[in-house]
């Protein structure tokens, strides 16, 4: 049975692990591919400690991002419903449509928060009325707000 050696991955490697993981691989794979390509480093005690420190720091950063998103969610939902004026034709049908950019702009004007328009899910809006819109602030946090489309 061949000996195995431990390496710390510097980036994600399919079927092996994520950045910062300590994995055991065949010595030839480590010496001939992983280490020369910069994909991994030899797992010494100091390197393992440093990798654990980096992982903990990354975990704390992700937690802080999620808490920031929760704060933004509260601020956005507190001011709901938001009014968007649109030109109206007959039968209360609006000209054009309400886009995610319109929603992002109205949130910026009212809540003073800049939101990425790509994270906003707007239903098809063709009439005046109140509509539910989902604003994704973080992979785990989304705000549900109401948009009131009014005549201009």
Curated annotation (Swiss-Prot):
Q: Which SUPFAM superfamilies match?
A: L9 N-domain-like, Ribosomal protein L9 C-domain
Any one of the GO BP annotations: translation
Q: Which UniProt keywords apply?
A: Ribonucleoprotein, Ribosomal protein, RNA-binding, rRNA-binding
* Protein name per its UniProtKB record: Large ribosomal subunit protein bL9
Q: Which GO terms describe its cellular component?
A: ribonucleoprotein complex; ribosome
Signal peptide feature range: none
Q: Which domain of life is it from?
A: Bacteria
Kindly give the InterPro entries that the UniProt entry links to this protein: Ribosomal_bL9, Ribosomal_bL9/RNase_H1_N, Ribosomal_bL9_bac/chp, Ribosomal_bL9_C, Ribosomal_bL9_C_sf, Ribosomal_bL9_N, Ribosomal_bL9_N_sf
- For this protein, what is any one GO molecular function term? rRNA binding
* Family of the protein in this entry: Belongs to the bacterial ribosomal protein bL9 family.
Q: What does this protein do?
A: Binds to the 23S rRNA.
């Amino acid at each position: 049975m061949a000996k195995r050696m431990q390496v710390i991955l510097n980036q994600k490697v399919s079927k092996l692990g994520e950045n910062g993981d300590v994995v055991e691989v065949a010595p030839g794979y480590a010496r001939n591919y992983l280490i020369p390509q910069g994909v991994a480093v030899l797992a010494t005690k100091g390197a393992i400690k440093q990798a654990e420190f980096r992982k903990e720091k990354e975990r704390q950063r992700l937690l802080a991002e999620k808490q920031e998103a929760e704060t933004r969610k509260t601020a956005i939902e507190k001011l709901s419903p938001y009014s968007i004026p649109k030109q109206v034709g007959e039968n209360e049908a609006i000209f054009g449509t309400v886009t995610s950019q319109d929603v992002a702009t109205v949130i910026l004007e009212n809540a003073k928060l800049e939101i990425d328009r790509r994270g906003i899910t707007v239903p098809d809006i063709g009439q005046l009325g109140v509509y539910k819109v989902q604003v994704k602030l973080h992979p785990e946090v989304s705000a549900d707000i109401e948009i009131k489309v009014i005549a201009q």
